[in-house]
């Protein structure tokens, strides 16, 4: 059984026009199996953010293919792309992007609400993920009432609560 969750196959990304091309990603290939963690390291300007933007469908590749659970995401457009982002990706932003007017519980449950999850399921899953990340004590707090580490774990909970293929 192939448990490859992500396969990046010979991708390239260029910016600019024909007379002034910048190569941001040059023939990158790798795969990640379910449960594995991947770290991407490199100097400034080496293409790390561009690579992640292509994997997350924020940007498109110039050539090559990216497969998530065997599906070529470089061919997705419109509603297929929106559906993929909503169901298969979980984002944790560097600055967390928690909504200041919502409690931790509401920030986490928002991802489930957007995904169309039933309220009874939301009431079950939010406490489960909060327990797993040891943030039960902040569920009724607003972001300004939490430490940076607590905010980071709430953002991680929000990204993971929908069980995406990739975080």
Question: Locations of the language-model features?
Answer:
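ABC family nucleotide-binding domain
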Residues: 4-167
